[in-house]
Amino acid sequence: MEHQGQHGHVTSRVDEYGNPVGTGAGHGQMGTAGMGTHGTTGGMGTHGTTGGMGTHGTTGTGGGQFQPMREEHKTGGVLQRSGSSSSSSSEDDGMGGRRKKGIKEKIKEKLPGGNKGEQQHAMGGTGGAYGQQGHGTGMTTGTTGAHGTTTTDTGEKKGIMDKIKEKLPGQH
């Protein structure tokens, strides 16, 4: 939008792209600059003026987008830990050294109910570890397991949730 020949406005000239070209004089400008452009094709400018805020004869000053300062988290070089606990990826091998734990051991360690290592050995062929179906010899009907529950071999497969519920203490 050009304001040519109007009283109180500077005659604005535009280049081949429609951008205002400064005249160098700057008479009659109020010096108002702000966000939001009207009639300009880019930058932070004002309506039909070529400068603003004391910049005489310069056009197109300022960036294309306003980006507010980003507030960053700074901890002053101190690492902050979350509240979650983690288990070690290795354990004592009984010979004075360390051995790497498998996924099964890590999962067992996370489950409530204490150490299940002794109970798995006591169950023998009647059941397996967590997530494994018990494969017996077929002669284990009516035997008592480590928890005092009696298992009967009905040939019916248990669901995963039933197996987990069976392993949890206090659910019998």
From Swiss-Prot:
It is found in: Cytoplasm. One of its GO terms (cellular component) is cytosol. Residues 1-172 are annotated as: Disordered. Type A repeats lie at residues 3-28, 125-149. Belongs to the plant dehydrin family. The gene is RAB21. One of its GO terms (biological process) is response to abscisic acid. Residues 21-65, 124-139 have a biased composition (Gly residues). Residues 140-153 have a biased composition (Low complexity). Keywords: Cytoplasm, Repeat, Stress response. PROSITE patterns: DEHYDRIN_1, DEHYDRIN_2. Induction: By abscisic acid (ABA) and water stress. This is Water stress-inducible protein Rab21. Type B repeats lie at residues 98-115, 156-172. Residues 154-172 have a biased composition (Basic and acidic residues).
